[in-house]
Amino acid sequence: MFGSVGETVVDLYAGIGYFTLPYLVKAGAAHLHACEWNPHAAAALRKNLALNGVADRCTVYEGDNAKVAPARLADRVNLGLIPSSEAGWPVACRALKSDKPGMLHVHDNVTVTPATAAANAEGGADGGVPVPATYRRTEAELTAASLTARAAEIAAALTR
């Protein structure tokens, strides 16, 4: 989020402003395009933007991201939806500027395999032992590889 001074940001799952407001109030985004399908959340977002004095730097789009999200204008796109934002990845890629590299902030839950969970639970009555850093790194690398492969598929589909 930080390092977005002067940037145009798209927040695909804006809600009431969990990420929208910090981008505008603290991180210095020039303009943010906030997409939200829930009209009650969108109304609360508008109120929160006004209360924080940044409503003039945010455009709120109500509806399905695939239909309302802007295209080819973002320096970065936030996908703050869990357990997975994968359904929004193609929309996010379309939102990025086409003339320069951009940044996608992908939110996703990482799961632990049953075997690993069982091994950790054997650590004692306190619920297990800490997961070794090497395991966390391996899980992160596998997740990153999966995300990279999926992003390449989406990018290829967008150029067709």
In which residue ranges do the predicted regions lie?
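C-terminal catalytic and target-recognition region of SAM-dependent MTase-like enzymes
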Residues: 73-75, 84-86, 91, 98-160
